[in-house]
A protein has these predicted regions:
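Conserved beta-strand segments of alpha/beta enzyme cores
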Residues: 44, 68, 173-175
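Short active-site loop/helix that positions an aromatic residue
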Residues: 199-206
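Conserved core of the sugar-phosphate nucleotidyltransferase
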Residues: 56, 60, 103-188, 203, ...
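Residues that recognize and position ribonucleotide moieties
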Residues: 14, 101, 138, 191, ...
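N-terminal glycine-rich phosphate-binding loop and ensuing alpha1 helix
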Residues: 3-49
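Short phosphate-binding loop-to-helix
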Residues: 51-116
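Short, conserved phosphate/pyrophosphate- and ester-handling motifs at nucleotide-, phospho-/glycolipid
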Residues: 194
């Protein structure tokens, strides 16, 4: 059975344009994300961006570093995921946001393990299940994506994908993946939406990079637990967030 990690990333962003290519210690954020996943788990990775000219720099970065890249519609993410999965013969997708440089590779591995126990259309890990925000992912079956594409032409669902599963949960086999207790920190926000978020991510990398390039989620959580003042960097932007 074929699994693949698809990282969705695009250059355009109303809040922080070009964030995928912002550099963390002289290396692009999305490149650090990909190399982080490659270091910890052995699942094929493809970066899915759009055919829009604004995303040429992302495609160029992939080419430079020999990273698999697929380009599809800018605003129809469902179609982009389907076409990307088909082109790489993935039956199940582990979807990762390009805004999440501290994605937990163990979460991705656990999603695959859970699906091997009993096949699902959609398995989600989120801050509602205890994961730090920006560290979790979702597993999606290719079959369920094709059903969504057939059943709706609503631009909101086609662009954002995940809400369709929750709004039509009776039509799918859905399972949730709780976080391990030792990293259960749903109030920690590690996704990059604003400049302040990027500043926090930089602080975390600055702590580890002098002596360790790759660090796991438990190490990140322990560092923040012992330096909670860092949470103030972006806390005013994400009060009461849910996902």
């Amino acid at each position: 059975m074929s699994y693949g990690i698809i990282i969705q990333s695009r250059f355009s962003s109303s809040r922080l344009p070009g964030k995928a290519l912002l550099k963390i210690k002289n290396k692009e954020m999305v490149l650090r994300q990909i190399q982080r996943l490659q270091h910890f788990i052995d699942i094929p990775i493809v970066l899915a961006t759009s055919t829009d000219v604004t995303d040429d720099p992302i495609a160029d970065l992939c080419k430079k570093h020999k990273i698999k890249c697929y380009r599809g519609p800018l605003n129809n993410l469902v179609q982009r995921l389907i076409d990307c999965a088909k082109s790489h013969k993935f039956k199940y997708i582990i979807r990762v946001g390009g805004d999440d440089p501290l994605i937990d590779p163990e979460c991705c591995a656990k999603l695959k393990i859970e699906n091997e126990k009993e096949k699902q259309d959609f398995i989600y890990a989120s801050c509602r299940e205890g994961w730090p925000y920006g560290c979790a992912a979702e597993l999606i079956s290719l079959n369920s994506l094709t059903r969504i594409l057939s059943n709706t032409n609503d631009s909101f669902y086609l662009e954002h994908t995940i809400p369709y599963y929750f709004d039509n949960y009776k039509d799918f086999k859905i399972k949730k993946l709780p976080s391990p207790k030792n990293i259960n920190r749903p109030n920690y926000y590690f996704s990059v939406d604003y400049e302040e978020d990027f500043k926090l991510i930089n602080k975390i990398f600055e702590h580890f990079l002098p002596h360790k390039e790759f660090f796991d989620m438990k190490e990140i959580v322990n560092f923040i637990d012992n330096n909670k003042e860092l949470l103030h960097i972006n806390s005013n932007l994400h009060n009461g967030f849910t996902r």
